[in-house]
Structure formats: structure tokens, C-alpha cells
Amino acid sequence: MNPNQKIITIGSISIAIGIISLMLQIGNIISMWASHSIQTGSQNHTGICNQRIITYENSTWVNHTYVNINNTNVVTGKDKTSVTLAGNSSLCSISGWAIYTKDNSIRIGSKGDVFVIREPFISCSHLECRTFFLTQGALLNDKHSNGTVKDRSPYRALMSCPLGEAPSPYNSKFESVAWSASACHDGMGWLTIGISGPDNGAVAVLKYNGIITETIKSWKKRILRTQESECVCVNGSCFTIMTDGPSDGAASYKIFKIEKGKVTKSIELNAPNFHYEECSCYPDTGTVMCVCRDNWHGSNRPWVSFNQNLDYQIGYICSGVFGDNPRPKDGKGSCNPVTVDGADGVKGFSYKYGNGVWIGRTKSNKLRKGFEMIWDPNGWTDTDNDFSVKQDVVAITDWSGYSGSFVQHPELTGLDCIRPCFWVELVRGLPRENATIWTSGSSISFCGVDSDTANWSWPDGAELPFTIDK
């Protein structure tokens, strides 16, 4: 075969191979089209891949993700309808407290991006519980954590994150600029209350579902402040208590009734020898009970209960098992302020059951260390110091801090009663731990159960100082 013939032969073979390859590709395309037509022939919709839709349904954010796999729509999440949290049930009967959450914020923050916080609290809707907290606009183990022992600054903000998680920039939601705050859910939306501004002119900003609805100006120009725990919603109305005036003497105390973020009624308490700060409130059979901090002259805790018309009653827990810190040794109580070691105090809570009371308190009389729950079967009305149950939560050798109540409604739990719960702040750093330049806290929480519970210590557990402190 001469060279020309070889060239012609090779060219012919190449052309033949190219034609065969082209025919195979065309056949493949026809096959895929036919297969797709068969699968979709009986359907009347067009498949869309990776379509992400966010809807707003009854004031509750619902997130749907549609992913088309072989023309089958897989939907994650489901519609959540709104309800009205009635708050008409009674508190559940309980015999003790089961550990619910522990976020280990300080331990995780030694290496991870975790906010410097204080004043954490928990509040629940009919769908979920969330941890709320006041940040310092800084992260642990970072230079901006220096000086965060200060209570009130323009860098503080109310934020929230999923329950039990360490609060970080990656899981937290901004709620309000605030150095004092409260939040609660009425079944249709979140009400947040954030107080910020100068001591002589602070303003409370009310938001409903994230939108500003009302503001309340300091009426005494003496550090307007609120609960540092959840407000209470009953039959569509939410209630909170604010204080304005001296922390070491008679001040002004107001109850606010709020509907969808708007104040519909308010009253000032007539309580000349009482002192109410940082109240821990809960619903019980349609009324609201608040147990508060007396920073003026009481080592027992003051209370105020009121109905939806704001008709109220006031008093002090009578038990000789004293609930504040600092406090004297347990002894004879009083239904008026117990003035021994009555100055100063710490945010706390109690739950009333008839004439009995569950008292949450630090284990130390003088320092914010340890925590325990005590059941005094006659402590709401009687002045003796006899109790029948004591449950340890944090050992006296470990730091605690603020504590407060929160509840889970039947709409969340499926129970026929309101479940009582509480949280404890575990403060670390300044002013007690001088090896650090910062102040922050983690938290634990418990819920009431009528079954077995444990006596133990669930401390913060972080090893200090951090790298930034050295």
C-alpha cells in the first residue's frame, strides 16, 4: 500500500469512529429525555432543584427546604400554628428537680468563640425554649473582655441562642440593645424588653416579633431596671415589673400589662416598706406570682401576686429558711422584712404551693457559692425553719450567682399543668477571682418532676486563668 493509500485509509477510519461516537451521544441524550418524560408524565408540576423558601406564618418563622431528588420533593420542617398561651393551669405537682441543661460556656470559651455574658435566663414558647443573655460585646479570652465586670455599658445587648448551647456569634440571635432585660412568648410572638441608656435617663424598648412597638422612659431617673428573667403571658397579655429608684432604700415599682408589644395598663405598687428588684415571675391558675430581691433591708424575699386586671397582693415569704444572700443562719422567720444581714442581695426565686414553698438559694450565707432547693411545707405562711426536702445542685465550694424561674406551658409539654423550672448562673472571673481580667458566666437549669432526682454538684468547671489573663 503506497503512502497515499495509507493516508486515505487512516482518514476513513477516523471519520467512521467520529460518526459512531456522535451517534452514541445522540442516543444517550434521547434515552435520558425519554426516561425523564416517563417519570414526569403523570405529574402536573415542574421539578425545581435546590429551591429554598422562607414563609411567615402566624407570626412564627417556618423554614422549608425543598430538594428535588429523582423528582421527589423532600420537605424538612413543618408548619407551626400560633396559639394563645392561657396560663390558666396550676403548677404541676413535683417531688424534686431533674437536671435539664448545662451549657459549659466558660470551659468551651477558653478555646472557642463564646460571648462574655451575664444575667442569662430561659423562656419558652409553645414550640421551644431559648436561653437569653446580656452580652458585653466581647468574646472570652479576647482583649475586649477586659473590664466586663461593669454592669451597664453601651456595648451590652440582649441576645438569645438555642437552649443548652454555649452562646456564640454563630448560634445567637440579636434581640435588643440592653443592660437590663426580660422576654416572653404569648403563643403568637416574642416580646422583648431591653433597657439601655444613662443612669439618669434610661429607656426600655419594647419589641414584638423584633419590631419596636413602645418605649418606657425612666420615671425616677434612678437606673430604670427590670427582671433579668422571663416576663409572664396569660391569655394573650404579658406582664412585667420594673423598678426605678435607690437600690438601698424605698424605690418605685410598676407592673405593666402589655399586649402585642403595646402597654395597655400599668400601676405603681403601694409598698412603702418593701423593696422589689429583679423579680422572678410565673403564671399559676391565671394569676401571676413574682418573688423578688430586697436589696434594701430584707434577707427573706418579697413577693407580689396579681391578676390580669392588676389587682395585687404583697408580702414577704414568712419561712425561717431564708432565701437571699447575704442572710443570717436559718431561724425564726417573719412575714415582714428580716433585717438581719438584710442589706444587698442576689436575684433569686421561689415557687408557692398552697402554704408550702420551694426555696432556691445559695448554700453559702455570705458568698454567692453553691446552690440548693429546699421544700418547706408551711414556709409561705409559717415562720419556723422546719423543712422536709433539700436537694443539692451546686457544691458550696463552687461559684453560683443569679437564679430565676421559668415555666413550660401545657401547649409545649402536653401535660395538663404548668411545669416549674429554674436556672442558675455560674459566675466566673472578677470580682472574686482576681487572676482574670473579665467577668462571665455559664448556666445550668432544672425542671420539676414527680419522680426520682439526683443530689449532686453541676459546677461551671472552667480552669482559670485563661491565656488573655497571663
Curated annotation (Swiss-Prot):
UniProt EC number: 3.2.1.18
Sequence positions that bind substrate: R118, R152, E277, E278, R293, R368
Catalytic residues, chain numbering: D151, Y402
Residue ranges, annotated region (Involved in apical transport and lipid raft association): 11-33
Virion surface side: 28-470
Record topology, Intravirion segments: 1-6
Keywords, sorted A to Z: Calcium, Disulfide bond, Glycoprotein, Glycosidase, Host cell membrane, Host membrane, Hydrolase, Membrane, Metal-binding, Signal-anchor, Transmembrane, Transmembrane helix, Virion
Catalytic activity: Hydrolysis of alpha-(2->3)-, alpha-(2->6)-, alpha-(2->8)- glycosidic linkages of terminal sialic acid residues in oligosaccharides, glycoproteins, glycolipids, colominic acid and synthetic substrates
Glycan attachment sites: N44, N58, N63, N70, N88, N146, N235, N434, N455
TM stretches of this protein: 7-27
Classification via SUPFAM superfamilies: Sialidases (SSF50939)
Cofactor: Ca(2+)
Domain of life according to the entry: Viruses
Biological process annotations from GO: carbohydrate metabolic process; viral budding from plasma membrane
Listed name of the protein: Neuraminidase
Pfam families, alphabetized: Neur
UniProt PTM comment: N-glycosylated.
Main location: virion
